[in-house]
Amino acid sequence: VTFHQRTALATSALPTVRLIHTSDLHIGASLDERGQAIELAVLEAVVDSMTAARGDLLLVAGDFFDNNRVGRATVEKTNAVLDRLPPWSSLVVLPGNHDSFGPDSVYRRYRIGSPGRTVILDDPAGRCVLFAQHRLRVWGRPTITHSENFRPLAGAPARQPYQWNVVMAHGHFTGEASQCDPPRSSPISAGELRGVGADYIALGHWDLRADVSSGGATAWYSGAPFHGWQLGAVQDVLLGPGRQVRVTERPLSGPGEAAIGGRRSEETGRPAQVIGRTDR
């Protein structure tokens, strides 16, 4: 891109883009048939939300799968649901701590999603993907080893004024401190969020929805889309005129509700406290 092209891009209006942000689906966690059916029903509800919202990109910010031992049958059933994503949309998946991108990763062993429409953020140093039609780029650094030394936002690229800048990360928010006491694995500090310079930071790792925006950085944990036998919600993120970012909660619904046995409660829709799962 030349200087004159950059100037023209910077002064022209960015297109409106809608993101659907989710995380922590933990597909493959259940060993019984009913549990497996529920996992797929939740994914169906997430996919249906893309169609209903006319979402452009579906962002899965870690722990799409519960572990790296999931087999071919689970992946094939997952892909059958992902094939229902609307034809205009794309899927971006960031490996988290449960489905980390190590040598035995499910993402190395199997194809996930439709070729040409699915991106796995699989570079240990961080991968940046440009969606030219939306003038939007997505960056994320996959979890390789879930430890206190892994900083999910390390190496994030500088902000580009002529594009939408979206960052994905999977880890534990530590507030203004750089680390917790006792230390937590995959820490993310408020200072790191501010330093990224992204228009939106899609976070995963916490099961409950939480706004951890800091300074000018709009950063949210989507929370898991399923809570206690009830469908939850996804984040509906509209990148719009004037470089405004509007984040709303979109409750999930659909045919899968009957299989699951209920809908989200009011409790699951409330902002989360700053907590994380104890097994992480």
Give the residues covered by each predicted segment.
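Binuclear metal-dependent phosphoesterase catalytic core
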Residues: 125-132, 219-278
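Short, mixed charged/polar active-site loops
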Residues: 16-18, 135, 244-245
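N-terminal active-site segment of His-dependent metallophosphoesterases
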Residues: 1-81, 87
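His/Asp/Glu-rich metal-coordinating catalytic cores
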Residues: 57, 68-229
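Non-catalytic terminal accessory segments
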Residues: 1-17, 259, 266-280
